[in-house]
């Protein structure tokens, strides 16, 4: 690696990191939060088997788990304008990633809810709680505890998936690296650099996952 490449990497580091702080991290946080809310609603509908709505959410989960995320991005950003729905790249990315996360996490939460011992609900009902209260105050907290590892896995996967937003012109880290590579003609080194930054983000989340798991295990 010659001095020119080292200088390019040093000069480009913050040019790649800043879009990460401005776009990649906010995109991850916003879409995971919205996706988690969608997942909770879908999981509850699936568990209670609410008529009509259950069939709709089953179809939604089937579609978003069965099609590539990149195709979903293109349909929402490039396809919807054909029926008069015009979205900015940022909004299209948020909608797509949120729906995708919601579909995957709903199955995680549904399994976690079903894994909670039925006696927990019976005990909650016996002290005067309604079905809804038992779900939100007793069952869901235990379900989240059971699902902490797969939910973190989904979050880590989402961090990496945000790089796909570059395909619809969202200037996140990968797009920033592409632009610098086009000017410097050093794509290999720059893509390795952006890979290292993604690795740092994901490693931090892995340690956070481990910390949360240890805290929950100590609480029993």
Spans of features found by a protein language model:
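Transmembrane alpha-helices and adjacent helix-loop boundaries
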Residues: 1-220
């Amino acid at each position: 690696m010659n001095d020119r490449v080292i200088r390019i990497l040093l000069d480009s580091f913050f040019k790649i990191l800043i879009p990460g702080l401005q776009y990649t991290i906010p995109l991850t946080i916003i879409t995971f939060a919205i996706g988690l809310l969608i997942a909770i609603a879908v999981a509850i509908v699936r568990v209670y088997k609410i008529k009509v709505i259950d069939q709709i959410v089953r179809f939604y989960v089937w579609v978003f788990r069965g099609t590539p995320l990149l195709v979903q991005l293109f349909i929402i950003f490039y396809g919807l304008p054909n029926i008069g729905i015009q979205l900015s790249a940022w909004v299209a990315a948020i909608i797509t990633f949120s729906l995708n996360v919601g579909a995957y996490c709903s199955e995680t939460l549904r399994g976690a809810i079903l894994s909670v011992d039925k006696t927990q609900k019976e005990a909650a009902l016996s002290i005067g709680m309604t079905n809804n209260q038992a779900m939100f105050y007793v069952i869901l907290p235990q379900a989240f505890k059971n699902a902490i590892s797969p939910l973190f896995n989904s979050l880590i996967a989402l961090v990496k998936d945000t790089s796909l937003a570059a395909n619809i012109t969202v200037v996140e880290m990968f797009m920033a690296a592409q632009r610098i590579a086009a000017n410097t003609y050093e794509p290999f080194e720059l893509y390795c650099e952006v890979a290292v930054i993604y690795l740092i983000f994901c490693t931090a989340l892995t340690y956070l996952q481990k910390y949360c798991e240890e805290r929950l295990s100590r609480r029993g």
